[in-house]
Amino acid sequence: MQRYLVGGAVRDALLGLPVKDRDWVVVGATPEQMLDQGYQQVGADFPVFLHPESKEEHALARTERKSGKGYTGFICDFSPDISLEDDLLRRDLTINAMAMDDDGNLVDPFNGRQDLEARILRHVSPAFTEDPLRVLRVARFASRYADLGFTVAPETLQLMQDIQASGELKALTAERVWQETVRALGQKQPRVYFQVLKDAHALQDIFPELNALFGVPQTPQYHPEVDTGLHSLMALEQACLLSEREEVRFAALIHDLGKGVTPQEEWPKHHNHEAVGVDLVKALTERVKAPKLFKELALMACQYHTHCHRALELRANTLVKLLQSCDAWRRPDRFELFLLACEADARGRTGWEQKPYPQADFLRGVLETCQQIQPQELVAQGYTGARLGEEIQRRRISAVKRFKQDNAPEAQEKGGEDVGLT
């Protein structure tokens, strides 16, 4: 039996990047031999073992044969006569189909190193099309290595389009879609993930609400980039500069879903798109089973981003209602994430990338002002029940009025009815 370091560890080592996880392939062994040497079996579908000391994963070399739809419809053969090249052949990309023996010798039957140096993401074999998950994986790799100049090979993109045309993407579970997506959101350039999905015609299947934004115009005065889909990707790009939080990036990306269903005769205006978008955001986040904070923040950004942009103009009572709607008193940390998503939206426009966004600091000040009203003090003064709530509200509004006079004295006030907070 012979073991080889494979996959991402070899790829990243050759790129000069830190190697986080090391996976091994074992050739010429049986499960019984692995157990006899002290390895612990952990794989259910095919034999994967943990090294008795390092606890690194060691998988028996295997081949996979398509037996049904989706990414789970495979029959595995892990007999001892499976060669290393047989195992590498089943992998998705050439840069992931390299191996290294214990002496550091590279095994590269599919020219992965050449593609690595050329910065190309290329499929190993036509069997690439047998696994629909690879569409998302390639998009994620494209986003992960975009800053190094990697692009998807045209012939690989064609196979991704073929997978989409086959309808196989519908076999992907929500969990796998979200797993790939949230990993992409954590990369330096997640915009590339969604762009590659669009180029592969897969965005319409995976995120149809987002795909619907492309080709929808906005008012050039406020959106020189015009296209709503492009604006959404630009907002995501700006969110990456403002925060490493995947929740902020996701919220910035899908805040304008309501514009995708605006009747064409109303273009380029999108009246009430914030409220219209709420159901679309709910549908998307529930379909992909996004975690609770992702869903909450995306809904807030969708429903209230216009209020945030116009914060300096809003009346004191409307500002207090906005903070109440965002549950800012009890969840100030989430409100801060909301402000970052709104700032990303404002800056995600051609020519606006470097412009200041005073609304965020203004609303931070409004929240801090309201937090100085202590309910305990009012209780001590005898306020209870409904009277207590009314007095807290009255004092918050009065305090915000004074704050506005000091910090936004020249802003033209607009009532809550103008932004849907009546």
From Swiss-Prot:
User: Which residues hold CTP?
Assistant: 8, 11, 91, 137, 140
Q: How is the cofactor bound?
A: Magnesium is required for nucleotidyltransferase activity. Nickel for phosphatase activity.
Which E.C. number(s) belong to this protein?
A: 2.7.7.72, 3.1.3.-, 3.1.4.-
- GO molecular function terms noted in the UniProt entry: ATP binding; CCA tRNA nucleotidyltransferase activity; cyclic-nucleotide phosphodiesterase activity; magnesium ion binding; phosphatase activity; tRNA binding
Answer yes or no on keyword RNA-binding. Answer: yes
Is the keyword Hydrolase in the record? yes
Organism domain of life:
Bacteria
Q: Which cofactor does it need?
A: Mg(2+); Ni(2+)
The secretion signal range is: none
Give residues annotated as binding Mg(2+).
21, 23
Extract the SUPFAM superfamilies matched here: Nucleotidyltransferase, Poly A polymerase C-terminal region-like
- Catalyzes what? a tRNA precursor + 2 CTP + ATP = a tRNA with a 3' CCA end + 3 diphosphate; a tRNA with a 3' CCA end + 2 CTP + ATP = a tRNA with a 3' CCACCA end + 3 diphosphate
User: Which GO terms of type biological process are on file?
Assistant: RNA repair; tRNA 3'-terminal CCA addition
* Every HD domain range: 228-329
Function, as annotated = Catalyzes the addition and repair of the essential 3'-terminal CCA sequence in tRNAs without using a nucleic acid template. Adds these three nucleotides in the order of C, C, and A to the tRNA nucleotide-73, using CTP and ATP as substrates and producing inorganic pyrophosphate. tRNA 3'-terminal CCA addition is required both for tRNA processing and repair. Also involved in tRNA surveillance by mediating tandem CCA addition to generate a CCACCA at the 3' terminus of unstable tRNAs. While stable tRNAs receive only 3'-terminal CCA, unstable tRNAs are marked with CCACCA and rapidly degraded.
Read off the domain note: Comprises two domains: an N-terminal domain containing the nucleotidyltransferase activity and a C-terminal HD domain associated with both phosphodiesterase and phosphatase activities.
Family indicated by similarity: Belongs to the tRNA nucleotidyltransferase/poly(A) polymerase family. Bacterial CCA-adding enzyme type 1 subfamily.
Instruction: Please give the subunit comment from the record.
Output: Monomer. Can also form homodimers and oligomers.
Q: What is this protein called?
A: Multifunctional CCA protein
Give the species this sequence originates from: Hahella chejuensis (strain KCTC 2396)
